Amino acid sequence: MKPNKVIITCAVTGSVHTPSMSPHLPYRPEHIAAEAIAAAEAGASILHLHARDPEDGRPTADPAVFMRFLPVIKQASDAVINITTGGSSVMTLEERLAAALAAEPEMCSLNMGSMNFGLYPMLERPRDWQHAWEPQLLEATRGTIFRNTFADIEAILKRLGEGCGTRFEFECYDVGHLYTLAHFRDRGLVPGTPFMQFVFGVLGGIGADPENLVHMKRIADRLFGDDYRFSVLAAGRRQMPMITMAAAMGGSVRVGLEDSLYDGRDLATSNADQVRRIRAILEGLSLDVATPDEARAMLGLKGGDRVAF
């Protein structure tokens, strides 16, 4: 694994949580832009972005919605913009790719395997749902699979990677996903040093336990030697403990309201709250935080002047 400064990624809104869970979850384009810009000002070098319907907050893959906030963020910040290709588990591959192909960003996420992606346990907490789609979407994950076949992964690598010069945040939800990434690397479809996001705590993926982080890193070391970089995200209350451990092990970190709605014991009032908290932890550990340009150099990105927005 290549050592360097710690990259802070902020996942601003995602498609996991719903508006009824927090009044601070951004879903209108102007709010997503404002939250992203504030997170960058707080120290995030990479902004991971989904889009939501401006009327009711449901996840959307509509490129027109993305284009209502992407240029605003770019004009106000030099942070790396990373667009999802995961979208949500109920979207088709073409829907999930539409915005990224239109925007040709520096980075995109790329999920490394099909899996159960259970959000339905969040139904167990009584709520006054603001919109009918919210419990319906959560319940749908009980019987659906988040599809990321070998053919899907190869198509994304070729269409976005080879076609647009986009680099990837390879999202690995379990050990087998590391072997899938190695498979595509060995076939020549993953040039350069891969940037892996170890994802912990999603129901259907690997649990958010320290032993699992050690195991994931050990397998990555075996498969990639020192030619990789890794970051960690953890869902919910395990967010800060797991990413702090990752940083101490030489990795980078991801925060944001996509992954956890909390800052300490209370609801986070903004994405920037979480960025400031992890930045303070990193600085307390005498770890240097990467600037956007340092992150670009570490990850071999094409630069913000070569995107289509």
Predicted regions and their residues:
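Structured C-terminal cap/extension of enzyme domains
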Residues: 179, 218-222, 241-309
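N-terminal small/glycine-rich loop or linker at the start of catalytic domains
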Residues: 1-24, 127-133
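Glycine-rich, proline-tolerant flexible connector loops at the mouths of alpha/beta enzymes
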Residues: 20, 45-67, 199-204, 261-265
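Catalytic alpha/beta core domains of metabolic enzymes, predominantly
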Residues: 107-256, 268
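Alpha-helix-loop-beta-strand connector modules within alpha/beta enzyme cores
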Residues: 10, 58-83, 156-159, 216-225, ...
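Conserved, mostly hydrophobic/aromatic
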Residues: 32, 39, 50, 108, ...
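Active-site mouth loops of central-metabolism enzymes
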Residues: 14-31, 85-93, 142-147, 169, ...
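Active-site beta->alpha loop and helix N-cap motifs at the rims of alpha/beta catalytic domains
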Residues: 60-147
